[in-house]
Amino acid sequence: MKRLALALKQKKVASWKLEEVKELTELIKNSNTILIGSLEGFPADKLHEIRKKLRGKAIIKVTKNTLFKIAAKNAGINTEKLEQYLTGPNVFIFTKDNPFLTNMFFENYKLRRYAMPGDKAEEEVIIPAGDTGMPAGPILSVFGKLKVQTKVQDGKVHVVKDTVVAKPGDVIPTEALPILQKLGIMPVYVKLKIKVAYHEGLVIPAENLKLNLEGYRSNIAEAYRNAFTLAVEIAYPVPDVLKFTISKVFKNAIALASEIGYLTPESAQAVISKAVAKAYALATAISGKVDLGVQLPAAQQTQTQQSTAEEKKEEKKEEEKKGPSEEEIGSGLASLFG
């Protein structure tokens, strides 16, 4: 037994494993980010498409989990938190890029494969019209089961019109599988499932790698609108805000001049219009009690009444409208503008 144990100890490690560990160690040392993806259920032949797409941005390696673990330790990484992810067939992605952006690539990059029994359609599966290249024979009955109209021309089966054989969510009919393969139709999407990312000492599980860009855009846009509204309200002195602030101040000044009857070239029209409206309103109110010696046009009376009503509405709005308190403005400035 002692001799057997000694022989096992002296057994040499395969040279390819040593080379693999050496290469992996260098890759780990030269990468800011390492992603571990599961190859379970993922067609191995599709990896070359991903390699092609990420050429110059990332290096993709399929290796044994034990070899990666040894290399990681050699590179000074504590693999304790990665242990749970080093199971089953894995692929390792080495990159200098941000882990979130790299994961986004894998989230959005879908590959196609041929359908297998039990697969569900993610989109309409269509057998297109035209020459199938298939010789007439038993295959015609299969087309019949799928309710695909066909005709035989020059000994070949031709599909008369585009036909949907599966809708989104439907299981793709087993009868359709050989036809889809012969026609080169790959209706099933597959994507590499990322398990975890290791970035500069941080272990980031897959669920924490997903970015909700639309949500972020919406939040930023809302924050900008709120900040801009506040900035206009307090006349914060920056170019983008001042042009709106000046416009608002000008309108308020004209409204005030109109109310107190202050005449300037800019306010004259508003002041006179308001004075005329008030005069007609007063004349209308007393015309039934006092003979004014003039006939008020009916249309003008209606217009005056409408103007008076609108003025009351505007006054009510102004009364209801309350600006932010000094404390609110102070806290808003502190949070928005440092």
Curated annotation (Swiss-Prot):
UniProt keyword Glycoprotein present: no
Domain of life per record: Archaea
Gene3D superfamilies to which the protein is assigned, alphabetical: 3.30.70.1730, 3.90.105.20, 6.10.140.760
Endpoints of the signal sequence: none
Bias type Basic and acidic residues, positions: 309-325
GO biological process, alphabetically ordered: cytoplasmic translation; ribosomal large subunit assembly
UniProt keyword list: Ribonucleoprotein, Ribosomal protein, RNA-binding, rRNA-binding
Biased composition (Low complexity): 298-308
Gene Ontology molecular function: any one: large ribosomal subunit rRNA binding
GO cellular component, one term: cytosolic large ribosomal subunit
Pfam families per record: Ribosomal_L10, RL10P_insert
Keyword Ribosomal protein belongs to the record: yes
Region (Disordered): 298-338
NCBIfam families: PRK04019.1-1 (NF003095)
Family per similarity comment: Belongs to the universal ribosomal protein uL10 family.
Role, per record: Forms part of the ribosomal stalk, playing a central role in the interaction of the ribosome with GTP-bound translation factors.
Assembly and oligomerization: Part of the 50S ribosomal subunit. Forms part of the ribosomal stalk which helps the ribosome interact with GTP-bound translation factors. Forms a heptameric L10(L12)2(L12)2(L12)2 complex, where L10 forms an elongated spine to which the L12 dimers bind in a sequential fashion.
Protein name in UniProt: Large ribosomal subunit protein uL10
Organism of origin: Saccharolobus islandicus (strain M.16.27)
